[in-house]
């Protein structure tokens, strides 16, 4: 076995694709296994910004979605070919955006083939060009180091038994698979070899054939009927399947079947559903075959958790678990006692033996009702509290939605705008939420924009540090191009009915604050953003449909998925009364102010801010900067790369471009040394009575980069009134960073590594590279305070 290539596709540091080459057993052929990073499959079917070229805007895709792929060189045709081809990666209901019921109803069409999801490990059976059968697991062949017998070995033994039962040979099967150019896909279920969640003993052991895939990059697979016929001809175990015509019929059946986790009186893990799709992320396929799965949540979620905590216990680690807390704690106590009495049980368990018998022994001794146990522990012990977390910008209607729900169900609304700003604000917000939980409320609305990624994850961290069992429900408001103008008009019509944004203090000020939020906004992206990955539920809302309809969406989602939280089904009159309360009766009484105490001398200007006048700006800026149009910066970058004969994807793909671009003129951290210059900026803003402080033009002189950050170095137009009144020795535009851990201000350190004489430059660091920008490129932006 040799490890070969590692390829990055979506700009991440870790490899998207890795390859390992194996010597095929009893053959002269080498087969290369291609393993794709699991998160990349999720990215590939998402609209994450990582899936789009930052310069051209074209969609970036994986070369194939195959999960389980082996290639080899065919000496006869003198070309590389796919020898083993697994399924395209498919997802559970609600696991990714394209497998929500709403999405499936739009991009899939029937008939829907349901196949029972057998509970084992996947085995691939294919043929080498020389007519030999090859059997593999998902990513390996033959003997695996550290194992006395591998999955592929056991799979091949079962294959021989199945073929013998119908008087067939491996050579005959190889000939048939070569003729079809297909891979047979089966589930190895054998408790004598390895236990999983469901039992497979006696005559139920063997290879369950559930797929025949064409050996090509696109996903082309045989129907369940063809697979069943093939299984019968070649002696495999058959997988039960049946059809449903509509998505609505399918959904009703699956939700009913999940109540007891059985089908035809047999406990099963769930179903795999096969259909056809026209989703845009699958456009590269010539086929439109599409799979998704419906795994019964109970009791198998609890069984999987028990398996994991048991292995932690045996390994000497402290068992960590988030659901079914009460019964899992009892199960761990039982296992601890059992293993102290029987050391062999530990050894067998780590070899995946005795898993089911240990679990069954605990259930019998505890005399527990299995389905009632798992459901009640999930809802009561696992997630006792529910927090609604909007992801929005100003004016989307989140407070109105919150107040409608408060009126309907008594769910308290914790408003960040009702809490003092300043240091420790996020923790105060979290503590206020926890206080409501401790006061006996099971649902709380976290009324804050949560528009920045780390705000969303920090909120979870701060709350879970103080209280267990919180279910986090994300409420992302759509942020389409027409939303900013729509919500801006809504805010202006609202007037002064807000704790901190008062239209009477100036329309320009309101627009400036809103623009700052737009620039900071990071879309909710559980597939591509680690800060968003741990939310339990997602309910998409839309500012354009109105707050009442958004409130109905939340209620309808809860009725379907968390019905115990909806004590009564509101009538139309109830909704109308709640809307009237939220819009007409509720009036914010708290006045949130920023900056210095307004009792100080009227219109006093200090290095901290401007106070006293209602039309001035009481909150001290973080910095003053020139805000630049994103498209202008990107087109300038394209121009520079074109002249240098460089391609972004080839030379700079490791960097992720910034969401917005600016040139920092002076930062609040520079006030102690440069207070006089800071006060000049404040005075200018005060005199103009607006945050729009005038346009400034710059010349882009160099493109500079190292392994962490890439930026433009710029110089200011000498005719500007601000020329010479900046505190950055090298003005610049940070273009991108190599990871989310790298901060944009590192451009300052990067430029310090170069020796500058006017526009002439000399590198003192071999890791720093640069391009001189010629001919001249001029870029212009608006000087504004940034809060």
From Swiss-Prot:
Keyword terms: Cytoplasm, Ligase, tRNA processing
EC number: 6.5.1.3
Name listed for the protein in its UniProt record: tRNA ligase 1
Function summary: Required for the splicing of precursor tRNA molecules containing introns. The ligation activity requires three enzymatic activities: phosphorylation of the 5' terminus of the 3' half-tRNA in the presence of ATP, opening of the 2'3'-cyclic phosphodiester bond of the 5' half-tRNA leaving a 2'-phosphomonoester and ligation of the two tRNA halves in an ATP-dependent reaction.
UniProt key word Ligase: yes
Gene that encodes the chain: trl1
Classification lineage: Eukaryota, Fungi, Dikarya, Ascomycota, Taphrinomycotina
PANTHER family for the chain: TRNA LIGASE
Superkingdom in the source lineage: Eukaryota
Residue numbers annotated as active site: 117 (n6-amp-lysine intermediate)
An example Gene Ontology CC term for this record: nucleus
GO biological process, one term: tRNA splicing, via endonucleolytic cleavage and ligation
GO molecular function term, any single one: ATP binding
Organism: Schizosaccharomyces pombe (strain 972 / ATCC 24843) (Fission yeast)
